[in-house]
Amino acid sequence: MTLKYVVNNTFYTNINQVLKQEFHISARLLHKLILSKHVCLNSVPVDTRNGVSINDIITVNLDFEEESENIVSTKMDLNIIYEDDGLLILNKPAGITVHPSILHYTDSLSNGVKYYFESIGLKRKIRPVNRLDLNTSGLIIFAKNEYVQEALIQQMNNHVFTKEYIAVVSGTFDKKAGIINLPIARKENSIIERCVSENGQTAITEYEVLNETNFFSVVKCKLLTGRTHQIRVHMSYIGHPLIGDSLYGSSSDLINRQALHCNFVSFEEPVSHKVLSFSCELPEDMDILIKIRCQNTFS
């Protein structure tokens, strides 16, 4: 993956200025690119202090042969939604973690992505951009290089990156759409559980009721921040815990995990700056749940 810029003004006096202003490359990555001779001026590797002139061509090779040495390569079936030189977007099933852990050392999604990269001849670090809980399904994005990862995380921080979820929750809403703005913190004496707390970090969830019966609602949730368990905590706090969420509500005979699915993402592609949008269907367990309880099929 390559960045290219043709100098068209006299404002810039050196390559460093161009790379920071035009591409917003971090100092850390810039240092790494220079050491690896991945920055070229008119096809010649240079230092960023080199001066520039009108019509000079600056190119930056963003790809490195590097691996996540602590991640084991494991063959698995990946549901690939989209792939290009900088991105891999998957539809993650429930019941699989994104990152390896002591309990999931070889069967996380990252293990499968590493195997996939190796199978197509790529040596890359595994760089998940967004997070999904073990029992949350849906769209998950992996960056193929540090530049794309940094750019997308920055978009999340600037609220340019859109993430939408479908949740099935208990009860019905008096207000069919709204914004939940309640800070979230780690619950005292718990490693996993979160709670609404005035001492927590800002957490904002936008919601819209799509379908409902007397006892259940299908809700679209848009994250304006990205706190751990944010939708689950917010919905539980306002009296509408997710169906099947044993941590913030109660388990259910209708579904064996929390009924939460990331069905839509939209962001600006870091190199072309085109807006990319992706969606995926509900998994079978949630589709059946909605048919049974809401007497309607969401699609």
What do these predicted regions represent?
Residues 61-63, 188-191, 202, 245-251:
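Short Pro/Gly-enriched beta-strand edge/turn motifs at strand-loop
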